[in-house]
Amino acid sequence: MIESFKRIYDNRHEYIGKWKEKHPDRKIMGYMCTSMPEEIIYAANALPIRILGGHESQNVSQQHMMGTFCPFSRDVLAQGLLGKYDYLDALGITHTCQHIYQAYESWVLHKNIKSFYIPTPNTSQTPHALPYLRGQLKLFLEKLEDWTGRKIGENDLRRGIEIVDTTRKLMKQIYEMRKSESPPISGLDSMLMVVAAQMSDKEEFNTILEDVIKNELPGRKAKATPSSRLMLIGSEHDDVKFIEMVENLDAIIVIDDHCTGSRYFWNTTEQNEDALTDIANRYIKKPPCPIKDFPVRKRTAHIVNLANEWNVAGVIEIQQKFCDPHELDRVAVSKALEKAGFPILNLEADVTMPVGPFRIRVEAFLEILSSEELF
């Protein structure tokens, strides 16, 4: 049921605690970036779960991270230092931004936890990226074999691909339904769906998705009256209060591009080569975040295409305060959207602070969209 998305998100630690009771022999790896190859972790019979912040003020990360690092990275580290994720057997990360990598290093240092780092390519726009990444995934696989005491074969990898790709296909099917004039699911429930998928056992979660698609979404309307169709883009964003505030106004978010949204699941695995090569190829081709989108900026065309396909009236770009990659990306993305005829509202957020101050700006933006629709 759709309510399951929020229940898993709100009770993520209790969910994993119960899962661990049912699967005492399986290990759990937390990860901090959506470039982490979950397929290989499932192939090792372990459970990958995404680590996110708690959206609460805290005072435990200041001595470990600079104040000019993004609030999200400091919030994530605080979760580890406060013991919220003490059930993890390991922590994993790929090449990512400096801020979240510092959270990872400090967590590993102070919690003395088994760690895995995959130095994924800085950019996918080179012919060397695929063979390089395949080699790094092979090394990661071998380390997982040592960690779990389990040999990982081709069939295991294919099973991991099947589990994760099924989740991706089902969530994309739901996103496609949001193209309709009266979307059957809100932007908030869509975001909760994606983060719940990141925080749960996908074999269990896939049955929930199938049930929602078959029994809940047909004929359903997320909003009773027509509303301004918005796109949400920017850095990591799982702020329930913000999305709730936007959709309580005369608006509905119908599409997004961020790592707790479509970017996480947008492409599936093309099965053309051996499994490791196929997995590497999938991550090379996934919609990039700003830190990997060079020398040619490809994100802008992808974002504009989404805005067109989902027929949005305007775009809200919300970035974490001090998020350098998105700060550098913001101007190019904004210009591309404006050139394509999409008004954009740029906001800078602190995930640990109230969202009330944004309400006036969002209301003003919606008034502009309404006046443009009249003419």
Residue ranges and their predicted role:
Residues 34-35, 39-52, 234-304:
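Redox- and metal-dependent alpha/beta enzyme cores, enriched for Fe-S-associated oxidoreductases
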Residues 1-27, 138, 142-267, 292:
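A charged, amphipathic alpha-helical module
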Residues 52-58, 120-123, 257-262, 349-350:
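Short, acidic/turn-prone active-site loops that include or flank metal/cofactor-
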Residues 33-84, 89, 103, 108:
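An N-terminal, globular interaction/scaffold subdomain
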Residues 331-375:
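Peripheral docking tails and interdomain loops at the edges
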Residues 55-72, 264-279, 361:
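N-terminal beta-loop-helix "entrance" segment that forms/cooperates
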Residues 80, 294-311, 328-329:
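A short, acidic, amphipathic alpha-helical segment used as a generic capping/interface helix at domain edges
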Residues 75-146:
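Acidic/His-rich segments in extracytoplasmic proteins that coordinate ligands and/or metal ions
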